[in-house]
Regions:
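Helix-adjacent hinge/juxtasegments
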Residues: 110-133
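Soluble, non-transmembrane catalytic domains of enzymes that act on hydrophobic metabolites at membranes
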Residues: 1-14
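Catalytic core of membrane glycerolipid acyltransferases/transacylases, capturing the structured
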Residues: 60-117
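Hydrophobic/aromatic ligand-binding patch that stacks against planar heteroaromatic rings
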Residues: 82, 103, 128, 159-163
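A cross-family acyltransferase "interaction/gating" segment
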Residues: 148-182
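Helix-to-loop junction immediately C-terminal to a conserved catalytic motif
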Residues: 32, 38-70
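Residue-level preference for the first positions of well-ordered beta-strands
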Residues: 63-65, 133-139, 169
């Protein structure tokens, strides 16, 4: 991917206007369907299967908070396979938006900064569940693990769950790191 680089002094960089916040978009059904179709070969190759426990208690049009462990690059494909056709927005680092913001927003990504308090993210998540009526996919570990094991969750995740006031769904994956390590 090519990134445009502009040479400027430190003072010129500071004089740049601040980035304007954009509200999240409801994920496009077209992009969700393409992602599901593109995911199929990898999931078939891994003999992917899942067990849904208690999902019948959540209505198909009811937004929820989806918490998923993050152990390899197949995570998004697995989430799409498990949750399809339920629309969901994905919490994603802002550096993933460089050069492809329109695509990331069309898929339903919400930009955030890692490892710091981000009140804008909480407001965006509230906007998704209350206004857009979409679920939110969150990887609370905030990074891939290097050995496929789970890392401790931050204590602030409880505050987030309480603020959203929606059902919580947990997707726990096993063995995918062995298939597609980092």
């Amino acid at each position: 991917m090519k990134i445009k680089v502009v040479d400027m002094t430190y003072e010129q960089a500071l004089a740049q206007p601040p980035q304007v916040h954009k509200k999240p978009k409801k994920p496009s059904l077209l992009f969700r369907t393409i992602l599901r179709a593109a995911s199929a070969p990898d999931l078939l190759a891994t003999h992917f299967h899942c067990e849904k426990i208690g999902m019948a208690q959540i209505k198909s049009d009811e937004p929820c908070l989806v918490l998923m462990n993050h152990s390899c690059f197949l995570d998004l494909k697995i989430a799409e396979a498990v949750l399809y056709p339920r629309p969901f927005n994905i919490v994603c680092t802002s550096d993933g938006f460089v050069g492809k913001e329109w695509l990331m927003r069309s898929v339903g990504c919400i930009p955030t900064r890692k490892f710091c308090s981000d009140t804008t993210l909480v407001r965006d998540m509230l906007y998704c569940v209350r206004t857009l009526k979409t679920s939110v996919l969150l990887y609370p570990e905030a990074s891939y693990s290097f050995d496929g094991t789970a890392t401790p969750l931050p204590e602030s995740i409880g505050k987030c769950v309480k603020a959203l006031n929606v059902p919580v769904v947990m997707i726990r994956t096993y063995g995918e790191f062995a298939r597609d390590p980092l």
